[in-house]
Amino acid sequence: MTSAQIIIVVTIVLYLVAMVLVGVYFGKKGSGSSSDDFYLGGRKMGPVVTAMSAEASDMSSYLLMGLPGLAYLFGLPEVTWTTIGLAIGTYLNWLIVARRLRRYSAKLGAITIPDFFARRFGDKKHLLSCIAAVVILIFFIPYTASGFKAIGTLFNSLFGVEYHTAMIVGGIVVVLYTVMGGFMAVSFTDLIQSIFMTIALIVIVCFGVQQAGGLDTVIDNARALPGYLNMTQGYDAATGTASTYSALSIVSTLAWGLGYFGMPHILLRFMAIREEKELNQSRRIATIWVVISMFIAVFIGVIGNSVTAAGKVPFLATSAESETIIIKLADLMSQHGVLLAIMAGIILSGILAATMSTADSQLLAAASSVSQDLMQHSFGIKMNQRTTMLAARATVICIAIIGMVLAWDPNSSVFRVVSFAWAGFGAAFGPVMLFSLFWKRANKQGALAGMITGGAVVFIWKYLIAPMGGAWAIYELLPAFLAACIAIVIVSLATPAPEKAVTDTFDEICSK
């Protein structure tokens, strides 16, 4: 191991130890002593922590690996339309969902998304919360797996550390601080990790431009690739020619933004903020950070292509390889002295941060679904506070293990795995969330129909319809989201109206 690699390893180890210490600190403070504290931090989150925790948990490894990799290999169309959709979705989620969800969930005493659905629609049998919990498990496990895959890829490509060993060690660190400190530990580590992610993005752009030969060289190189900068074409790296990116593809790619309305680990942040009025400040902070971060991430992919053209980084021919471009640039940086080696360590810690900040939130949301919604509400298992916390922590560990098993293949694509899980949550929960907050006539039968329809169409479209090609080959979130909305409306109108107590609560919430 070279001296530069030793410096990087020391930097990363210090970072990982710091994350565990945060978990220890909040564990001793009692932040994980009750279910309300463990899952929502006692609804005491400030606006800055709420904003950055929400967006750090949103911007998983696809920010520092998926987006740059996509831009590196195929040019701007898909990745740019995706980021535009995500930026719009982020803003609208904070603007129209956050305030009413915070108010509604506090009124009902709900501490998880499945619990909110059950209480909102007066589902005393908890069928809604049971189905919602199952949906969370189905889609969060592969989502978490993509994060563990990113950790393994980082250490394997940089140090030659065996992929599976690196993945397991990284997973253990995430599990440790999550089970010890709960929501508060997760949220404050997310804040710290968002800072590392920001530093990583800025530094790697500056270094990459310098290595490519300047900004003009980067732009000239991109222009020389057919369709690379064209928003309606795209670049085919396999043939070196331009490809077509149709209007239908643009619309379906913009549909990424719809996913935000159904992301449990993001929606929980809205429920946890200290004061409803502080959401305005959180919205501004979150939106600005997301827009700037995604723009820089895409630009890193373009820069990386130019650094490859300059002969300083080998060509990364596959999706899995192209997602390591930021790792390759950090490795190149580490070869330019001690100071830059330390910065490379910080950048790679930023990649870990992007992964860990999402994985911890997903593990926590999945744990709450199992211990609260499935075990207690659906199955009627009586548990005291201590047993509830033990069940939650055991669930975190079990889900992490399953996620590692699914991530065992080092050749899977982070971006593709995340896109499928994103579609699943967006279609299964997004329409139900919007109708629950804004349509009084929506009932539990309609919500159940929408949830099942959305989740099912994601699978059907991706594996049966999209392979037909042509106009059918669109992102599965768009048709699944629309199908879920239609199902909610039709079934709600075809079945009895909600009980008076349910509609009275809706009127009370909406009147404020």
Segments from the language model and where they lie:
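Membrane-embedded helix-loop-helix hairpins and adjacent transmembrane boundary segments
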Residues: 1-512
